[in-house]
Structure formats: C-alpha cells, structure tokens
C-alpha cells in the first residue's frame, strides 16, 4: 500500500498569470505557499478475488471493471494516462472539502499520480509530476485552471513560479 500526503496551497500574488492563455502572451509570475492541510491518497493493488477490478473511495464509492467506467474525472484520466488496468483500490481523504479554492483537485491529481508511479516503481521528478498533472487537468480534462496549483502541490513550501 502506498500513502501520499499532498499539500493544499494559498496563492498570494500573481494568480491568473499562470493560465496558459495569459502567460504565453504576457508572461507570468505567481507567489504561493502550501499550508498544513493535505490530500491523502491510499492506493494498493486489489487482490483478484473481488468481482470488481477497481474500487475508488472518495465522497462516493465506485466499483468497476475498467477505468473508463469511473465517474470521477481526474481518477479516470490518471488511470487511462498511466495505462493501469491491474486491480486497484484507491481511497481519498482530505483535510478540506473540494472547491475550497485551495487547489484541492490539483492536489488530488498530483497525489494520485505520485502514488501510482511509486506503486509501479517508476521514479518521477517533481517537475515531471507537476507537468503530468497539468497535462491531465488543463489539456485532457480542459479545466479552466492555471499551472500554479500543480507545481505548488508537487513541490510544497513557499515558491515563485
């Protein structure tokens, strides 16, 4: 079992300049820090005795045979992106509710990617972890968010991006 603890963040200056549509034309800079509130992901391979191959637990519980059947968009896209089809059980717990404005969805995505890369015994740099999370949420899921959330979640602490 792998357990990740990924921080939530507070943006102090420059929020909005991290949107691709802005920084590609004008540049951008963001000052943010992570706080002592976290997203926890517990992930483990699911033994083959169960009728389902994937169990995802968050505010809901999902059971399915294939990742494409998941309703949770970030979890579905992470499993698809990493091409994981082994039996898998994932539990999410957070110190704060979703939509808190503190980058919770990005912390979830970074934490899940980190857990699954670790389970696969694949090292990934913090930069690449943040970039994968950006690709998933901004490009594939087309969420209207900037990049600071993913970088803050991956690197933690006080940062200028």
What kind of region is each of these model predictions?
Residues 1-102, 106, 114-124, 156-158:
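ATP-binding N-lobe of GHMP and related small-molecule kinases
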């Amino acid at each position: 079992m792998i357990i990740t603890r990924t921080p939530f963040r507070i943006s102090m200056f420059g929020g909005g300049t991290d949107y691709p549509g802005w920084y590609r034309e004008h540049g951008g800079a963001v000052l943010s820090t992570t706080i002592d509130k976290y997203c926890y992901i517990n992930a483990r391979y699911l033994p083959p005795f169960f009728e389902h191959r994937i169990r995802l637990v968050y505010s809901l519980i999902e059971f399915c045979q294939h990742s494409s059947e998941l309703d949770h968009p970030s979890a579905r896209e992470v499993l698809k992106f990493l091409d994981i089809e082994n039996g898998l059980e994932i539990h999410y717990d957070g110190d704060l509710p979703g939509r808190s404005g503190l980058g919770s969805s990005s912390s979830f995505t970074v934490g899940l990617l980190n857990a699954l890369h670790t389970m696969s015994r694949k090292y990934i740099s913090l930069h690449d972890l943040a970039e994968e999370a950006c690709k998933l949420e901004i490009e594939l899921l087309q969420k209207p968010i900037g990049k600071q959330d993913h970088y803050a979640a991956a690197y933690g602490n006080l940062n200028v991006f």
